Structure formats: C-alpha cells, structure tokens
Amino acid sequence: AGLLVGHDAISAFRGARGGVPRRVIESIEYRPLGDDLALLVSVSRFVAGGRGLQTQLWQCIDGRWLIVAAHVTPRTPAFDRSIWRTVGDPLYQGAWEGPLAGLTVAVKDLFAIKGYRIGAGNPAYLDSARAETTTAPAVADLLRAGASLRGIARTDEFAYSIAGDNPHYGTPPNGARVGALPGGSSSGPATAVALGQADIGLATDTAGSVRVPASYQGLWGLRTTHGLVPRQGLLPLAQSFDTVGWITRDGDTLRRVAEWCLSYDGSQSTESVYGASAVDLPWSFFVPVEVRDAAEPSTRAAFDALGARLAASGASVAHVSIGALDDYQEAFRIVQGAEAWRNDGEWVRAHPDAVGPAVAARFRAAAEITPEQERGARAALVPLRARLTDLVRDRVLVLP
C-alpha cells in the first residue's frame, strides 16, 4: 500500500504482493485530465471480505495507455502476518511507572516470553516448540522500565539471513520505501517500528540483523557490544557473535532504552567496559578505510558528509586501515556456520523440507565445516579481534 510512481515501482509492488486476491469492482470513477491523461478511482469488494480503494493516473505514451502513478489502499487486516506472529493490546503489560512507560515493544521471535513458544521464523519449528516457563532478561528489563509488549514479531528463519524475506509468512513491507526489502533478520521488529505499530524493536544482531533493517527503513538501530546485554532466554544462531540490540524511530527513544538496559541488573555498565563513564568518554570516531572504500559512491559520499559534520562539531574522526576484509569475512563465516550447525543442525537434519531454500543452503554449507577449519578460523580471529580492539579503544567504530 502507498504511493507508487513510475512503471518500475508499480511492477515491483505487484511482484512483491504475491498475486491479487479475488475481488469484484463495485464502482469506478473516471475523470479525463487531457487528451493523453486520465484519472481512475475504483472501489473493490474482496471475495474473502473487506474492501479496497485504488487510484490510478493513466498516460498515453507512444500510443499505449500506461499507469504512471497509483495509490493502493488494501483491505484492513486484523494484523499483518508478515510482520507479527502474535499481537495484543498489549500482549504483556509493563510496569505502570518507569522511564519507558507508555512505549510499546515488538519482540523478535527468538526471545523467551513466559507462556509463549519461540518460533524462529519457521512454522514447523514453532509446532515442535514448548511454551517458555520464564521470560528472557532482555525482555523483562523493558517491562520493568514501563514498556509494554505489543507482540512477537517475525524474523528471517533462525536469524540466518539479512535480507528480511521469509518463505513461510511472507516478506514484511519496508516502511520507508514501497516494494523494497525490509532488511533482516530482524525484519518484523523493524517494520513494526517503521509503521508506527511499536515504539521499540527488541532484536538481535549477529552479522548486521539490527543495523541492516534499520538502515533499509531509515530507523535508529544499535548493536551493543558483544556480551553487554544478557542473552539468557535467547535462541542462539552463533554465540560468538550474537548480540542484543534495539531499533527505534528516533535517537531520543534509543538513548532512553540504552540508558536503562545498560545500567540494569546483569548488564555490564559503561564503566566496567571502558573504565570510564559515558560522559567522560571522548567525542571520537574510528572509520575503517577498507570498509569505507568498499561502499557504493553515493553511500560513500553521504558517509563522508556525515564525517565532515562530526569533525566540524569538534569530534575526532580517524580513518585507519584494518587489513583485508576477506580475512575477517572468512573467519567469521566459518565460526558462525559451525556454531549455527551445532545449535540447529540436528533439527534441520530431522526436518529437511521445512526450511526455505536460501537458509537451507546456508545450513548445508555449515554442515560441511570441519573441526580443523573451525579451529583455524578461531585462531585467525584472535589477532583480528585484538587489532580492532586496539584500534577502537575508547572510540566509536563507524561503518557505512
């Protein structure tokens, strides 16, 4: 739904929605706007119930009448199953008072919530799961702060993707651009936040699953330092890299969430990680040259403009080489795959037809990783991690 301009955008929308539901045109309004321009507005009654509204601007180009702009208002669903697995008003009520009182949360379908099963983006896995007896600390912390759970939001299967599509439940819409992928694997929480259906997305990030959907949908996303936020009650993909993070529409909400969750109970404080309070840390940023140079020209230009604004504000922005990106990627891929197979391989092997093609291919590749390869990759990660830690120190690592 939304405004579509141009043949490409209209074709992309038609392709993404997976066909047109059976419907009957109840009425059409036609208004000529000139010899080669016409406006059509129609009301449809769907066979399965509900009505929709469609507005089309037609133009005669080279003797052919084409739709050059359109607006589609589909029938209103109870809730969008591509975004939500379970939704309530609220699903869980938070504390009546607290710094996050009045805000709602979309929880990625990997976190334990008492009384609910973890579905991991796969219906067969959901069917075989048992209801959780406790709630994950990352969820409970938000409830204690006054936020309420709006619902359980979709994820790419087992969080083993960053595209945002799901072959079982459909692809959540992109709240910033019609027809575009939402980004994953935290696709459901990101789209829920982008569409205003939740204020906070509680998500995970192993290889970009907070940052990618936030980027695709114009949101604020934070991948926290590995181990900073408790991961108990989280279905893992790869423990060496899994992190808990949040997605919001604005920086102030993200700051409020982080201030609470990074100072509560089991979360390590800024002082314990950096040896200094947040207010004492320098306004300093670190840009890896190889990552910056790998970006597309338009992205690189926007990123450089941000760096210039930061520098103009008095910040220190350092551009430093981190070495060949392939070294990082290969070591990461092997360790991630080995851990993913240990976590989910037994279930995947027992349900060979239950996983979508893209994720199934990743699991097949993961199953082929040998212990020797994993040991070698873990050994390779040690100096790479040490190098990044030494370069970052008390600076903020910034990537385009």
Question: Would you name each region that the model predicts?
Answer:
Residues 71-131, 135, 158-160, 272:
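Short, well-ordered alpha-helical
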Residues 1-8, 205:
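Short, solvent-exposed secondary-structure junction/capping segments
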Residues 51-77:
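Short beta-strand edge/turn micro-motifs at domain boundaries
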Residues 143-258:
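Short glycine/serine-rich loop segments
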